[in-house]
A protein has these predicted regions:
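Internal alpha-helical transmembrane segments
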Residues: 17, 28, 39, 46, ...
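PDZ peptide-recognition modules
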Residues: 2-12, 81-97, 105, 109-256
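Transmembrane alpha-helix interface/packing and boundary motifs in multi-pass membrane proteins
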Residues: 245-249, 284-299
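Juxtamembrane boundary at the C-terminal end of a transmembrane helix
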Residues: 339-350
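Alpha-helical transmembrane segments of multi-pass membrane proteins
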Residues: 22-26, 77, 110, 114, ...
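Small-residue-rich helix-interface/hinge motifs
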Residues: 10-86, 294-313
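Membrane interface segments of multi-pass transport proteins and intramembrane proteases
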Residues: 56-58, 135-138, 307-324
Length: 350
């Protein structure tokens, strides 16, 4: 019986944590579109959080605000956004600069939310990890390869490291057990080629061994903001690199995760504490902030491409063509989500 209540409690925490994470990420994104549309004089017909049947709604200032049953999405419906409209306040009648602002605002809000969450994460830490080597473990392979105490790791394989976590991420990406490091030593840049680090296999996956510790520094207002900013840049770059690795085949497509995988990750993070959940929230909110700006039809980035073309041509592309292209992109994204969800379920079963 105790085991049952424990499992039920764990399930409830996962559900609540998932609703919280998805809800706040979607709400902030749509809020960006909503606020900039209102600021630009564009008529917003509806602002809804969630999908499916409406649980609660009210109308104010010509806009219907609603909460829907399934916490898996949300939307801002603007006049003339997806159909021809001659009404005052139509999206298509607004200056192209205003429409660009409305289009990118959702992604910008996601990135800002990620930064704010990361400020909270950094504040919860006792010290801020630097990129300066403090000590090595006994038999350290990196030390034997030339890395020294006091070295500040600037780049791995030519890619700049903003935070200590970047070092781990770049080591993991090499998949070769060695990397080229650029370090600051006594104020001078030193290049260390073929620095070896240990790996081991666990459940068919190569795991990385970091055989040194880095220095920690005390927190100040400036250092917290700087670290949170660097974390934001780092996570954003990780999203871009991961997408690039998927496209180039560096990472197998069966590693792609969808909503089920995200819920599983939220479950694990929530069991580890608030700090881990907040870190995952930061990654999940920065991810759509970057992904939504990709030039893919049906995404904000796809609409941005149309607006840029309109700016260059000085006239818009026919809306019927834009709608058709966006519909094709939407079908593609749904197919990708189904594939990712199938991957997630397969991993859970296996």
């Amino acid at each position: 019986m105790a085991s049952f209540f424990s499992s039920a409690g764990s399930f409830l925490i996962t559900v609540l944590a998932s609703v919280f994470v998805f809800g706040i990420v979607i709400f902030i994104h749509e809020l960006g579109h909503f606020l900039t549309a209102k600021f630009s004089g564009i008529q917003v017909n509806e602002f809804a959080l969630g999908m499916g049947p409406t649980l609660f709604s009210f109308t104010r200032g010509g806009t219907k605000y609603g909460l829907r049953l399934f916490p898996i999405g949300g939307f801002v419906s603007m006049e003339g956004e997806d159909e021809e409209s001659e009404e005052a306040g139509s999206f298509t009648k607004a200056p192209v600069g205003n429409r660009i602002l409305v289009t990118v605002a959702g992604a910008v809000m996601n990135l800002l939310l990620g930064f704010v969450v990361l400020v909270c994460v950094v504040c919860s830490q006792q010290l801020i990890s630097t990129r300066t080597v403090a000590e090595f473990y006994e038999g350290s392979s990196t030390q034997q390869s030339g890395l020294q105490v006091g070295d500040t790791i600037v780049a791995v394989n030519g890619r700049r490291c903003f935070i200590a976590n970047d070092i781990i991420y770049e080591f993991a990406r090499t998949q070769q057990g060695q990397a080229d490091l650029t370090v600051l030593r006594d104020g001078k840049r030193v290049q260390l080629d073929n620095v070896v680090f240990d790996t081991y296999e666990e459940n068919g996956v190569n795991q990385l061994v970091i055989d040194f510790k880095v220095l920690g520094e005390k927190k100040t207002v400036g250092s917290v903001l700087k670290e949170a900013g660097n974390w934001t840049l780092s996570l954003g770059r990780m999203v871009v690199l991961s997408l690039t690795d998927l496209i180039t085949g560096r990472i197998a497509v069966n590693n792609l995760s969808g909503p089920v995988g995200i819920v599983s990750a939220i479950s694990e993070a929530s069991s580890l504490g608030l700090s881990s959940l907040l870190m995952l929230l930061a990654l999940i909110t920065i991810n759509p902030g970057i992904f939504n700006l990709l030039p893919i039809p049906a995404l904000d980035g796809g609409r941005l491409v149309f607006l840029i073309i309109e700016t260059i041509r000085r006239k818009p592309i026919s809306q019927k063509y834009e709608i058709a292209i966006n519909a094709a992109g939407f079908i593609l994204l749904i197919g990708l989500m189904i594939f990712a969800t199938f991957n997630d379920i397969t991993k859970l079963i296996v």
